[in-house]
């Protein structure tokens, strides 16, 4: 839906040299369309004022910037100085797009692991319950099942509001949204109204950005102090979650969830059983108990299901309906996806686990389902937190019977150096198999597996590429695994 608004409506307290109608607010000069206002602020490597000429060429009708301008960058005579512009962008975008987050029931999900699964499972559940639901996160934006990639877990503040408006205009009545620590720290969700905030867990990740776990946790906690928030769903099996729960605003409806019988939990899983068919447990919501039989794999998916249950309860869905819909939820692409497992082929699981905690959870969960060996294919991303590399090696060595180290988006970093960092975490490095070619590593793992083994391919999940030296090459773990499984499935024997 096309929009237009007078600049004076967006900046009523700013003296404008002349008023103009603007049809959009854009920070990227490359995506400016005729009629847009170009917002020139400091980026990570450059200032927007250096790209005014390109924005003008693309049809920008106004240029806004935050003073003072950097030394050496000319300021166009008709550019409009807006003090505190960066901090105002959320409110401006919210107003321009007609306050989209207020028109839908908004659930924000934050945490190190489980954001994507929780968002997708929640959107799936609400859709099954008859509420058209949009998603915004790692897997893209769109109504459930029709998401288109954005390239961000949480986009920048201007596109975030534009995408929420898009979801509203497409008919979404609710939105499940991933809210990363970067987004909270950088103001990407400024002026987004959330009804429910969900916390999954806090483990090591993004310390290349936050520096310390305390700062990382503080960024996550910002989601739970937002004005207008009605309910908080918090994992009480997580240490930081318990701290967050204890320090909550007393006027906030707080829903603690636990699969480990925490006393303060109002939503819990009891009598938990995992088998080759999935997960079985009794869902207890404030004393009302209903059975759940889920086809999902992995102990950590119990936590994801409980987070979904807590969010649904916060949205006033009845416990019996919640239990029924939890049993209907299907796996999310790239999250504990199953391949093989029949006709003589091993069970192969593709998962996004790319942090020490996520890898440990994936392996320990699959151990509960395994009849024989557990084979793990994993790597570590280049130009990211190097401290987690030896940690992931130690976890793979402890929890898997066979560990195969391979490439996982080396980016601009030397792949051999990444592998060397990983190998330092093995007590017996000679026992690890190194095969940097990821496709070859997947084929090797499946070739060595018996029908009673499980192969975990960890790290990339839904990603359709392998990034090497700044170039994203088409690559999909699930497709490669399916190709490797084909001879086993057809012949019923090890190739």
Swiss-Prot record:
<dbReference type="Pfam" id="PF08245">
    <property type="entry name" value="Mur_ligase_M"/>
</dbReference>
<keyword id="KW-0961">Cell wall biogenesis/degradation</keyword>
<keyword id="KW-0133">Cell shape</keyword>
<dbReference type="InterPro" id="IPR035911">
    <property type="entry name" value="MurE/MurF_N"/>
</dbReference>
<feature type="binding site">
    <location>
        <position position="384"/>
    </location>
    <ligand>
        <name>meso-2,6-diaminopimelate</name>
    </ligand>
</feature>
<comment type="similarity">
    <text>Belongs to the MurCDEF family. MurE subfamily.</text>
</comment>
<dbReference type="GO" id="GO:0008765">
    <property type="term" value="F:UDP-N-acetylmuramoylalanyl-D-glutamate-2,6-diaminopimelate ligase activity"/>
</dbReference>
<dbReference type="GO" id="GO:0051301">
    <property type="term" value="P:cell division"/>
</dbReference>
<feature type="binding site">
    <location>
        <position position="459"/>
    </location>
    <ligand>
        <name>meso-2,6-diaminopimelate</name>
    </ligand>
</feature>
<feature type="binding site">
    <location>
        <position position="180"/>
    </location>
    <ligand>
        <name>UDP-N-acetyl-alpha-D-muramoyl-L-alanyl-D-glutamate</name>
    </ligand>
</feature>
<dbReference type="Pfam" id="PF02875">
    <property type="entry name" value="Mur_ligase_C"/>
</dbReference>
<comment type="pathway">
    <text>Cell wall biogenesis; peptidoglycan biosynthesis.</text>
</comment>
<feature type="binding site">
    <location>
        <position position="463"/>
    </location>
    <ligand>
        <name>meso-2,6-diaminopimelate</name>
    </ligand>
</feature>
<feature type="binding site">
    <location>
        <begin position="408"/>
        <end position="411"/>
    </location>
    <ligand>
        <name>meso-2,6-diaminopimelate</name>
    </ligand>
</feature>
<dbReference type="InterPro" id="IPR005761">
    <property type="entry name" value="UDP-N-AcMur-Glu-dNH2Pim_ligase"/>
</dbReference>
<feature type="binding site">
    <location>
        <begin position="153"/>
        <end position="154"/>
    </location>
    <ligand>
        <name>UDP-N-acetyl-alpha-D-muramoyl-L-alanyl-D-glutamate</name>
    </ligand>
</feature>
<feature type="binding site">
    <location>
        <position position="29"/>
    </location>
    <ligand>
        <name>UDP-N-acetyl-alpha-D-muramoyl-L-alanyl-D-glutamate</name>
    </ligand>
</feature>
<dbReference type="InterPro" id="IPR036615">
    <property type="entry name" value="Mur_ligase_C_dom_sf"/>
</dbReference>
<dbReference type="GO" id="GO:0009252">
    <property type="term" value="P:peptidoglycan biosynthetic process"/>
</dbReference>
<feature type="modified residue" description="N6-carboxylysine">
    <location>
        <position position="220"/>
    </location>
</feature>
<dbReference type="GO" id="GO:0008360">
    <property type="term" value="P:regulation of cell shape"/>
</dbReference>
<dbReference type="InterPro" id="IPR036565">
    <property type="entry name" value="Mur-like_cat_sf"/>
</dbReference>
<keyword id="KW-0131">Cell cycle</keyword>
<feature type="short sequence motif" description="Meso-diaminopimelate recognition motif">
    <location>
        <begin position="408"/>
        <end position="411"/>
    </location>
</feature>
<feature type="binding site">
    <location>
        <position position="186"/>
    </location>
    <ligand>
        <name>UDP-N-acetyl-alpha-D-muramoyl-L-alanyl-D-glutamate</name>
    </ligand>
</feature>
<dbReference type="GO" id="GO:0005737">
    <property type="term" value="C:cytoplasm"/>
</dbReference>
<comment type="function">
    <text>Catalyzes the addition of meso-diaminopimelic acid to the nucleotide precursor UDP-N-acetylmuramoyl-L-alanyl-D-glutamate (UMAG) in the biosynthesis of bacterial cell-wall peptidoglycan.</text>
</comment>
<keyword id="KW-0067">ATP-binding</keyword>
<feature type="binding site">
    <location>
        <begin position="111"/>
        <end position="117"/>
    </location>
    <ligand>
        <name>ATP</name>
    </ligand>
</feature>
<dbReference type="GO" id="GO:0000287">
    <property type="term" value="F:magnesium ion binding"/>
</dbReference>
<protein>
    <recommendedName>
        <fullName>UDP-N-acetylmuramoyl-L-alanyl-D-glutamate--2,6-diaminopimelate ligase</fullName>
        <ecNumber>6.3.2.13</ecNumber>
    </recommendedName>
</protein>
<dbReference type="GO" id="GO:0005524">
    <property type="term" value="F:ATP binding"/>
</dbReference>
<keyword id="KW-0460">Magnesium</keyword>
<dbReference type="Pfam" id="PF01225">
    <property type="entry name" value="Mur_ligase"/>
</dbReference>
<keyword id="KW-0963">Cytoplasm</keyword>
<dbReference type="GO" id="GO:0071555">
    <property type="term" value="P:cell wall organization"/>
</dbReference>
<dbReference type="InterPro" id="IPR013221">
    <property type="entry name" value="Mur_ligase_cen"/>
</dbReference>
<feature type="binding site">
    <location>
        <position position="188"/>
    </location>
    <ligand>
        <name>UDP-N-acetyl-alpha-D-muramoyl-L-alanyl-D-glutamate</name>
    </ligand>
</feature>
<keyword id="KW-0573">Peptidoglycan synthesis</keyword>
<keyword id="KW-0547">Nucleotide-binding</keyword>
<dbReference type="InterPro" id="IPR004101">
    <property type="entry name" value="Mur_ligase_C"/>
</dbReference>
<keyword id="KW-0132">Cell division</keyword>
């Amino acid at each position: 839906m096309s929009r237009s608004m007078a600049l004076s409506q967006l900046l009523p307290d700013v003296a404008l040299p002349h008023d103009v109608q603007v049809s959009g607010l854009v920070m990227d000069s490359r995506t400016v369309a005729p009629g847009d206002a170009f917002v020139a602020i400091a980026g990570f490597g450059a200032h927007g004022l250096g790209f005014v000429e390109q924005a003008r060429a693309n049809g920008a009708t106004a240029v806004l910037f935050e003073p003072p301008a950097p030394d050496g960058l000319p300021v166009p005579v008709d550019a409009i100085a807006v003090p505190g512009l960066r901090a105002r962008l959320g409110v401006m975008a919210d107003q321009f797009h007609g306050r989209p987050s207020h028109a839908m029931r908004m659930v924000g999900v934050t945490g190190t692991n489980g954001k994507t699964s929780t968002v997708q499972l929640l959107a799936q559940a609400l859709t099954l319950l008859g509420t058209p639901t949009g998603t915004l996160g790692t897997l893209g934006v769109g109504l459930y099942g029709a998401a288109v990639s954005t390239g961000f877990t949480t986009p920048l503040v201007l596109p975030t509001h534009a995408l929420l408006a898009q979801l509203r205009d497409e008919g979404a009545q609710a939105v499940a949204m991933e809210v990363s620590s970067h987004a909270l720290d950088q103001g990407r969700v400024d002026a987004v109204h959330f009804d429910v905030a969900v916390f999954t867990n806090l483990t090591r990740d993004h310390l290349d950005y936050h520096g310390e776990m305390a700062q990382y946790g503080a960024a996550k906690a910002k989601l739970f102090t937002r004005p207008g928030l009605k309910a908080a769903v918090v994992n009480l099996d997580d240490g930081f979650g318990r701290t967050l729960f204890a320090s909550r605003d007393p006027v906030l409806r707080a829903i603690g969830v636990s699969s480990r019988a925490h006393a303060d939990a109002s939503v819990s899983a009891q009598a938990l059983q995992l088998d080759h068919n999935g997960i079985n447990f009794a869902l207890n919501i404030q004393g009302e108990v209903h059975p759940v039989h889920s086809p999902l794999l992995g102990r950590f998916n119990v936590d994801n299901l409980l987070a979904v249950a807590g969010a649904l309860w916060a949205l006033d869905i009845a416990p019996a309906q919640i239990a029924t819909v939890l049993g209907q939820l299907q796996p999310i692409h790239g999250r504990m996806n199953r391949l093989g497992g029949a006709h003589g082929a091993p069970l192969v699981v593709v998962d996004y686990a790319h942090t020490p905690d996520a890898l440990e959870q994936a392996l320990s969960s699959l151990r509960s389902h395994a009849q024989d060996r557990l084979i793990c294919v994993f790597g570590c991303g280049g130009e990211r937190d190097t401290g987690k590399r030896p940690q992931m090696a130690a976890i793979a060595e402890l929890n898997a019977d066979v560990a195969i180290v391979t490439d996982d988006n080396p980016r601009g970093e030397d792949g051999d150096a990444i592998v060397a960092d990983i190998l330092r975490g093995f007590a017996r490095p000679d026992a690890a198999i190194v095969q940097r070619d990821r496709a070859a590593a997947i084929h090797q793992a499946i070739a060595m597996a018996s029908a009673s083994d499980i192969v975990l391919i960890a790290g990339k999940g839904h990603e359709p590429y392998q990034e090497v030296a700044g170039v994203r090459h088409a690559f999909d773990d699930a497709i490669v695994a399916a190709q490797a499984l084909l001879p086993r499935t057809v012949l019923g024997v090890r190739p």
